[in-house]
Amino acid sequence: MADNSSDYRALFLNDVPMMDARAPVEFSKGAFPGVINLPLMNDIERQKVGTCYKQHGQDAAIQLGHQLVCGQVKDERVEAWVEFARANPNGYLYCFRGGLRSQTVQRWLKDAGVDYPRILGGYKAMRTFLLDTLHEAVTECDLVVLGGMTGTGKTEVLTQLPNGLDLEGVANHRGSSFGKRATGQPAQIDFENRLAINLLKKRAAGIEQFVVEDESRLVGSCNVPLELHQAMQGCPVVWLEDSFEHRVERILADYVVNLCAEFISVKGEELGFGLFADRLLQSLNNIHKRLGGERHQRLLALMQTALEEQQRSGAVELHRGWIEGLLGEYYDPMYAYQREHKAARIEFAGNQFEVSGYLSERSSRR
């Protein structure tokens, strides 16, 4: 058996398999990518033991825990742990603080003939390590913000750069009012953990300058860490440009063709299209106050007609109507205003090819 470990850096850099012995309610609030939740106690059992601990102390709580997790219940859980351990011989187990729960799981595994290491300090210590990783990256590394009008393909540029930090990808959201995906967003803690691991791996590869897309503090329901967002407000900006026509086509592909395919892939043909249509309509409704009544109704009529035609024939051409209106009358004026306020920070502007080349060359200067 490997020794118990507190080398959190190595655990995350090497994507070491981990088994989380916390209760499901704890796991759902925040965990690490790829980790499997195989709890010692379920939520109800944990609550009972916690209440007992507060009222009668640790010894009584431990005794109650053994009474609740015994017999067939214990056998089934141990069997699941053994299966995980044998499938992941290089893995580790942990609980919240690396205390009694993970020690109990480790001991019961040993009784079943399996020696398996645990992570010292548990989830709490690993979470602290990742928060420190975020802080160190923000304070020690250079940042460049990639800005541009809606539909210029900022994410396309960002994801092709070795030093690109894709906040929207980590948040599973495109960042705009229309940005929700067919699958949900991670919990806030999961978002932060994934972001920190991303930074850790890139820095381990020698990257000390990061390019981030110009985002508001919220990417859907995920908050960009305050320290990172504040740093983004003062760093240099590179502005991506493209023609209105190209931007319309890119938005048509991303927010209509690809999003519809996403929903159908997840939910099936009939239900998927209905949910896709509802999502588009709701996204437009979410900004109806900012659009104003007349403009909202006009764009809504165009969107409804386009959706009806798409459902009838599969054709998506009519969607260009509301996309052109939304860009020209809403997003472009808003982004033009933002660009004006960032003008002093913009150090380069160009098309995708030019911006990609500039950012690649810039990253080699440090």
UniProtKB/Swiss-Prot annotation:
PROSITE patterns: RHODANESE_3. The keyword Metal-binding does not apply. Its EC number is 2.9.1.3. Gene3D superfamilies: Rhodanese-like domain. Keywords: Selenium, Transferase. GO terms for molecular function: transferase activity, transferring alkyl or aryl (other than methyl) groups; tRNA 2-selenouridine synthase activity. SMART domains: RHOD. Monomer. HAMAP family: tRNA_sel_U_synth (MF_01622). Belongs to the SelU family. Involved in the post-transcriptional modification of the uridine at the wobble position (U34) of tRNA(Lys), tRNA(Glu) and tRNA(Gln). Catalyzes the conversion of 2-thiouridine (S2U-RNA) to 2-selenouridine (Se2U-RNA). Acts in a two-step process involving geranylation of 2-thiouridine (S2U) to S-geranyl-2-thiouridine (geS2U) and subsequent selenation of the latter derivative to 2-selenouridine (Se2U) in the tRNA chain. This is tRNA 2-selenouridine synthase. It comes from Pseudomonas syringae pv. tomato (strain ATCC BAA-871 / DC3000). The lineage of its organism: Bacteria, Pseudomonadati, Pseudomonadota, Gammaproteobacteria, Pseudomonadales.
